[in-house]
């Protein structure tokens, strides 16, 4: 067998009769079909019709199968290899500058996160920009505990005039500052959690001057303030920070408090959106960068702050460890739970990791259709099976199975919709783009921290995807080299694999992606022949 699910094994043994559904115990009335797609299947020459349904906030798959002519795994399929593939590290395929892959290296045109943290610590302003698909705007941000009347005047002069203070929920409750509207009633586009506005009672007059607003901000940031110290409503707008910060919500509210805490200051920050001096509209990135240069301010992106925190924060906890006898052999299974979203992941460990040096590693993204049902559209299930076989043969290694990566991060339903678009002529990249979804939104920080917890320090990474090298770098892990996972090409997955090579930089065999021949020309078969030849010479 070449699949990892006992459910799948049972169904295959029983012949997987037509109209058999793999579903939780529920009635059909509790489910809503979202999408369906014809799915060629890698085993027993069958085709299936997959329906994607949603019920009780969970996604389910209904499989209806029937026998079809043997056309899925072609007799003339170009073999990309089996266990005979060379298992020595290959480093030339993913050549890259270390600085380019450094998680602390800022996005081009932005300052580094450590620089911004230091400026926040010193009571300076920082410009924080969010994603272009979100607001694509910038906020002036500084630590609330460091605000001065002069700083407030600068913020009001260059901002909208709506000055907010982001705060943790505990402090808002201590000061008895309820939300302006309930979460259910909040119709603001990004669901920003405004509380009732306030002015400090002491040291203010109208409450609107720069001096008055600075005093109000300082009072909000003080751990000694009490509910009776404020008038309601007022001219400062507290915002409720979501626990987990930018790892939970990629907003300015969360970014500002994260920066204050990273600077070792009280968890409260001033923020105000920056306007274009020319026409009063919201300033977008080019104008924000001009403003930063003119005022000698650091400018950072929330995306960079997310990467910074992912590298340093503890993202997972070990739940349990148990031995498992798998079809490949005996493994120790480690369950981990994400501290960000509660998702559970699993690592299969063979042998003794020991000092963590030179470990054969596969970080595998969940693919229900490929890993469980043997879809011929992709090579995911075959890669997983080959990785497990290689580790079993080596006697020492780790497979980290990351859930929540379905469809390169777009989810099961969207993946099936993308399949329908591929049937209409798009490739795997174009289908995601037509749906308005990212081509690949996966993050590998969870996987990296699991490997660290298991004791892995240096590894031979089994992958054809350079993004995994990038995603695992910077977590105290060293990638000694790449081990290609060369699996069979079929008529069903040929275009998919060619698209990954041409548009996503995947590397098959030992050559850099720019030099690999096309799949249609049998180039990967030639690569495999070269690997086999090299193995024989060794």
Curated annotation (Swiss-Prot):
Chain intervals for the UniProt region annotation (GTP cyclohydrolase II): 312-530
Binding note for cofactor: Binds 2 divalent metal cations per subunit. Magnesium or manganese. Binds 1 zinc ion per subunit.
Biological or metabolic pathway of the protein: Cofactor biosynthesis; riboflavin biosynthesis; 2-hydroxy-3-oxobutyl phosphate from D-ribulose 5-phosphate: step 1/1; Cofactor biosynthesis; riboflavin biosynthesis; 5-amino-6-(D-ribitylamino)uracil from GTP: step 1/4
Catalytic activity: D-ribulose 5-phosphate = (2S)-2-hydroxy-3-oxobutyl phosphate + formate + H(+); GTP + 4 H2O = 2,5-diamino-6-hydroxy-4-(5-phosphoribosylamino)-pyrimidine + formate + 2 phosphate + 3 H(+)
Amino acids binding D-ribulose 5-phosphate: 134-135, 139, 249-253, 273
Main location (coarse class): plastid
Binding site for Zn(2+): 367, 378, 380
Protein origin, superkingdom: Eukaryota
Keywords: Chloroplast, GTP-binding, Hydrolase, Lyase, Magnesium, Manganese, Metal-binding, Multifunctional enzyme, Nucleotide-binding, Plastid, Riboflavin biosynthesis, Transit peptide, Zinc
Residues binding Mg(2+) 1: 135
Annotated transit peptide: 1-73
Subcellular location: Plastid, Chloroplast
Molecular function via GO: 3,4-dihydroxy-2-butanone-4-phosphate synthase activity; GTP binding; GTP cyclohydrolase II activity; metal ion binding
EC number(s) given by UniProt: 4.1.99.12, 3.5.4.25
UniProt record similarity statement: In the N-terminal section; belongs to the DHBP synthase family. In the C-terminal section; belongs to the GTP cyclohydrolase II family.
NCBIfam families associated with the record: PRK00393.1 (NF001591), PRK09311.1 (NF006803), ribA (TIGR00505), ribB (TIGR00506)
Function: Involved in riboflavin biosynthesis. Catalyzes both the conversion of D-ribulose 5-phosphate to formate and 3,4-dihydroxy-2-butanone 4-phosphate and the conversion of GTP to 2,5-diamino-6-ribosylamino-4(3H)-pyrimidinone 5'-phosphate (DARP), formate and pyrophosphate.
Protein name: Probable bifunctional riboflavin biosynthesis protein RIBA 1, chloroplastic
């Amino acid at each position: 067998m070449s699949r990892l699910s006992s459910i799948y094994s049972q169904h295959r043994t029983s012949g997987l009769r037509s109209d058999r559904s793999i579903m939780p115990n529920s009635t059909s009335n509790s489910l809503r079909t979202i999408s369906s797609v014809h799915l060629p299947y890698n085993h027993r020459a069958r085709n299936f019709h997959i329906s994607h349904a949603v019920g009780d906030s969970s996604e389910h798959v209904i499989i209806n199968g029937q026998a079809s002519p043997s056309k899925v795994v072609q007799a003339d399929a170009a073999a990309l290899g089996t266990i005979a593939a060379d298992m020595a590290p290959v480093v030339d395929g993913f050549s890259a500058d270390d600085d380019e892959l450094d998680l602390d290296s800022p996005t081009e045109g932005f300052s580094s996160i450590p620089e911004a943290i230091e400026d926040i610590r010193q009571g300076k302003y920082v410009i924080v920009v969010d994603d272009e698909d979100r607001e694509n705007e910038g906020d002036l941000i500084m630590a609330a505990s460091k605000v001065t009347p002069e700083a407030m005047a600068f913020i009001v002069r260059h901002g909208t005039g709506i000055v907010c203070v982001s705060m943790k929920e505990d402090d808002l409750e201590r000061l008895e500052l309820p939300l302006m509207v309930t979460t259910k009633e909040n119709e603001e586009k990004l669901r920003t959690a405004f509380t009732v506005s306030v002015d400090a009672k002491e040291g203010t007059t109208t409450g609107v001057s720069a001096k008055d607003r600075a005093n109000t901000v300082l009072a909000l940031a003080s751990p000694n303030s009490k509910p009776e110290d404020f008038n309601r409503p007022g001219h400062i707008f507290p915002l409720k920070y979501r626990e987990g910060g930018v790892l939970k919500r990629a907003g300015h509210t969360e970014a500002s408090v994260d920066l204050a805490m990273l600077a070792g200051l009280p968890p409260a920050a001033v923020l105000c959106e920056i306007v274009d001096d020319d026409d009063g509209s919201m300033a977008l990135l080019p104008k924000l960068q001009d403003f930063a240069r003119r005022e000698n301010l650091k400018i950072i992106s929330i995306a960079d702050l997310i990467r910074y925190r992912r590298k340093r924060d503890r993202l997972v906890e070990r739940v349990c460890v148990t031995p498992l006898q798998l079809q490949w052999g005996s493994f120790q299974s480690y369950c981990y739970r994400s501290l960000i979203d509660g998702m559970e992941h699993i690592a299969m460990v063979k042998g003794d990791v020991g000092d963590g040096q030179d470990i054969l590693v596969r970080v595998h993204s969940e693919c229900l259709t490929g890993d469980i049902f043997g879809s011929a559209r992709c090579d995911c299930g075959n890669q997983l099976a080959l990785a497990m076989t290689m580790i079993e043969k080596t006697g020492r290694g780790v497979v980290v199975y990351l859930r929540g990566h379905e469809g390169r991060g777009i989810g099961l339903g969207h993946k099936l919709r993308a399949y329908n678009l591929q049937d209409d002529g798009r490739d795997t990249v174009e289908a995601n783009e037509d749906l308005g979804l990212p081509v690949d939104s996966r993050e590998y920080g969870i996987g990296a921290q699991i490997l660290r917890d298991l004791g892995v320090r240096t590894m031979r990474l089994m992958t054809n995807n350079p993004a995994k090298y990038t995603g695992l770098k910077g977590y105290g892990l060293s990638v000694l080299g790449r081990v290609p996972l060369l699996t069979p090409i079929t008529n069903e997955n040929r275009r998919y694999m060619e698209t990954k090579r041409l548009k996503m930089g995947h590397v098959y065999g030992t050559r850099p992606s720019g030099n690999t021949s096309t799949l249609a020309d049998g180039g990967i078969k030639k690569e495999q022949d070269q690997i086999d030849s090299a193995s024989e010479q060794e």
